[in-house]
């Protein structure tokens, strides 16, 4: 029975990789390999990876549903709790950046998107945060630190305020 279950699973995986996600096959396989290698870790600390609030990390979000960040992307660490980090996924996609809300330059933009000002030291392109896709994840998903935003900086505080507005949709809460 166990052998049949395994064969059925492998056949299904093969079909999925060949048909449903052909454009993401490399990312999907890499994500699965990352999960196999790190999925049993309590945190990134188990492999010598220590993260701090404000770090921008390259990480593996794993498989995703539609409208969720998946596979390997950058993320901004907003908080740490019990070996898990609250991470906001980000992209350098120019079209997404152009659609992001900014009270001065794009007041009609999407409020779930937060454009980071300029190019952050350690990154190569302008980036935008997906505020409505933030989540707590095991820090073992994190592969490499790429940059850092000072938690006392005005930009970090603006991100925190926008999160509060997005979550509670009432500026008086802030």
Residue ranges, per PLM feature:
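Conserved functional hotspots at enzyme active or ligand-binding sites that engage polyanionic ligands
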Residues: 1-174
């Amino acid at each position: 029975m166990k052998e049949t279950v395994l064969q059925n699973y492998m056949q299904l995986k093969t079909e999925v990789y060949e048909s449903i996600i052909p454009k993401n096959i490399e990312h999907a396989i890499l994500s699965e390999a990352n999960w196999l290698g790190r999925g049993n870790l309590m945190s990134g600390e188990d492999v010598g990876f220590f993260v701090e609030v404000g770090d921008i990390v390259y990480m593996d979000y794993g498989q995703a549903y539609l409208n969720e960040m998946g596979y390997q992307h950058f993320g901004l660490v907003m908080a740490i709790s019990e070996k898990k980090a609250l991470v906001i996924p980000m992209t350098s996609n120019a079209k997404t950046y152009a659609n992001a809300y900014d009270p001065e330059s794009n007041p009609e933009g999407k409020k779930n998107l937060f454009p980071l000002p300029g190019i952050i030291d350690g990154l190569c392109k302008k980036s935008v945060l997906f505020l409505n896709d933030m989540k707590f994840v095991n820090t073992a998903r994190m592969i490499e630190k790429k940059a850092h935003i000072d938690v006392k900086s005005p930009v970090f505080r603006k991100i925190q305020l926008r999160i509060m507005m997005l979550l509670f949709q009432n500026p008086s809460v802030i």
